[in-house]
Swiss-Prot record:
Belongs to the ATP phosphoribosyltransferase family. GO terms for biological process: L-histidine biosynthetic process. This is ATP phosphoribosyltransferase. Keywords: Amino-acid biosynthesis, ATP-binding, Cytoplasm, Glycosyltransferase, Histidine biosynthesis, Nucleotide-binding, Transferase.
């Protein structure tokens, strides 16, 4: 198959090709019914049910491809968007890939405050963000900082042990890798997570909006459950405060005039507590249903 010629008239959607965001991104695409098959060693996959093509790229490159309009939309971390300094729309927080960009120093070293690193050597994969951070600490423009910012593409945590750096700035998820390298955090530069980003002038804007709507539906389905129960009318106001829904609960009359049926979306992580509170306030026949997908 000539993939290049088959890209004509297709929306291009950039996806991380590997790393911490890849698996969750692919799971999100499947939940949004974006069907595709990725051939071995190929970084382009044509959708079999929509006029789009997935382009698998390093997460760090995706903001530039989207910002320059080479692809219409993409999934990457906010840290990568900020580092690339590209003008894109952050369309959706995707609720995965959460981590922190932190200043880390040797556990047994003399540094306890990032200001102590001014004028020292810092190793990072995020040179732009590091320069901005130290420019603010030093109170000078980026071009005038005295801190020596060095770029490495990987294994940043080894820099201090190898004598290359006094401290590092790197992404930290659980912190286990940093602790294993004998490092400790002394400051957070940025909190980040995965985001759906969109070009300012995308091709196929209607298809972009449809994909965004589908992804919003998957995110809502993952976050919420449907809670149904019967409510005494004289307790309805109190019960609706417990289950207000995303916008409003659905209230339906029952044959018994003293009762009504309530249906409401509720946060999945809070549902046990919500059910306890409903029962305490007089609700009965409380049922909870999973939401496989939705549009919000």
């Amino acid at each position: 198959m000539d993939l290049v010629n088959n890209l004509n008239d297709r929306l291009l959607f950039a996806v991380p090709k590997k790393g911490r965001l890849y698996e969750k991104a692919v799971e999100l695409l499947k939940g949004s019914d974006i069907q595709f098959h990725r051939h071995n060693r190929l970084d382009i996959a044509l959708s079999t049910n929509l006029p789009l093509a997935l382009v698998f790229l390093p997460a760090a490159d995706i903001p530039r491809f989207v910002g320059e309009g080479r692809v219409a939309l993409g999934i990457t971390g906010i840290d990568q968007v900020r580092e690339a300094k590209m003008d894109v729309e952050n369309a959706l927080d995707l609720n995965f890939g959460s981590c922190k960009l932190q200043v880390q120093v040797p556990e047994k070293g003399p540094y306890t405050d990032p200001k102590q690193l001014i004028g020292k050597s810092i190793v990072t994969s995020f040179t732009s963000l590091a320069e901005e951070y130290f420019a603010e600490l030093e109170g000078v423009p980026v071009k005038d900082i005295t801190t020596n910012i060095k770029f490495v593409g990987g294994s940043v945590e080894a820099a201090c042990a190898l004598g290359v750096a006094d401290g590092i700035i790197d992404l930290v998820e659980s912190g286990e890798t940093m602790r294993a390298a004998g490092l400790k955090p002394i400051a957070t530069v940025l909190e980040t997570s995965a985001s759906l980003i969109v070009s300012k002038n995308p091709s196929h804007p209607e298809l972009v909006q449809m994909i965004k709507s589908r992804i919003e539906g998957v995110l809502a389905a993952n976050k919420y459950v449907l809670c149904n129960y019967n409510a005494p009318r004289d307790k309805l106001d109190a019960l609706l405060k417990i289950t207000p829904g995303r916008r409003a609960a659905t209230v339906s009359p029952l044959d018994d005039e003293g009762w009504c049926a309530v249906s409401s979306m509720a946060e999945k992580k809070k549902i046990a507590q919500i059910m306890d509170e409903l029962k305490k306030e007089g609700a009965s026949d409380i049922l909870v249903f999973s939401i496989s997908n939705c549009r919000v």
